[in-house]
Amino acid sequence: MSREHVPAAGSRRVALLAAVVGLATAALGAAGQDWPQWRGPGSAAIATGSLPTRWSATEGIAWRAPLGGSGTSSPIVVGDRVIVTSQQGRAPIAGGGQQPRLARDDRSLSAREAAIAADADPADALRFVVEAFDRRTGAPLWSHALRGEGPFPELHEKHNLATPTPASDGERVYAWFGTGQIVALGLDGQPVWTRHLGTEYAPFDAQWGHGSSPAVYRDLVILLCDHRSQSYLLALDAKTGRERWKVMRGSGRVSHSTPLVIAGPRGDELLVNSSARIDAYDPATGASLWFTGTERQTPIPSAVFRDGRIFLSRGYRNSDVLAIRPGGRGDVTATHVDWTAPNGASYVPSIVHYDGLLYMTNEVGIVTCVDAATGARVWQHRLGGVFFASPVAGDGKVYFVSETGETFVLKAGRTPEVLARNELDERFIASPAIAGGSIFLRSDRTLVAIR
């Protein structure tokens, strides 16, 4: 597997300070400054501190940074770095998939991307890129690329192979791609280890491409590979990439959710939202703990854990929202499911729990607010637009980002109130990251910092 590493200007300073990176990162994380994985600390999608309410294409933008490719993965923030993944070039796709465009049209592609897209052998041109930018200024710090290698899965036109959001434990960054390739990088961008799950285990054949992101637990990187044929849950050693445990999950369990690790009353639990049911495992060993739920088609939302309950939406069409207490064993349907709300569930965006209320939006911009204690609907409000990004909350506000670049800022509470509608003329599928009072939005081709 070929690899490329391109340090940007200023990376020498980063390398010289590598010995103290862990301490600096820990200090920032303790102050609530990091957003180290999909949906931030604890995957809760909640930020602390004061956050901006209004911005536009010309106001409130701290910086913009062009990306080295396209993708729908969300940014993460580790110390003074904002890290994001992208795809350069086009991948051959299996029958039944749809080829995503690199951006809205060829005019928006850089000369390099256009040349790659026109290459006679697109598989040779395909690159997966991990980039780091200075959190305060947007200056590029480093870029690492690896060659994309098949087998290549089916894809939906809304995304490409750079869909999983990277994760970090404060020492390394783990970037996963839709072929099954995963790379671990130091915070200086230097490669530590790589694996290709699509060739080592089985080709990735999740319907519409792979969307699940890595979850970090202690010294493990946990990966959900729910596919139409061989589905499995895998834990790799964070330092070496070696397999620590693997659980086969059968066939036909297609899902795109990201596993969530929580502290339950009887020990830590690893939660998985899949088409067959909801499962909890011991994250240290992969042992099954409990399960519940009936079959649903292709769940995408990830679970959230707040106030002693697990909340999640089950996915495609006429689905429901559940509140589950952890700590059970075996089938917990009759013992630990506190409530089920039959409508208002989101298909793609995940739920955010904020100050006792659940907020969710469907793909057509209808926001539903539910009482987290009872499951009773508090209100519904139509924003309009198309939504794939998951909402985030903080500073008494809830943020919803539409595909067409509108961010609706709602006042958190029992009455719907839109505080602002902020427009950026770009396409957004990725969910926001928040750190140090800044909101980071990733479009098709740009990383934007709002402050």
Which stretches of residues belong to each language-model region?
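General helical structural elements
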Residues: 7, 16-17, 43, 446
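Hydrophobic alpha-helical segments, especially transmembrane helices
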Residues: 13-14, 40
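N-terminal secretory signal peptides that target proteins for export/translocation
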Residues: 1-12
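Short intrinsically disordered, low-complexity coil segments enriched in acidic
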Residues: 2-3, 17, 84, 188
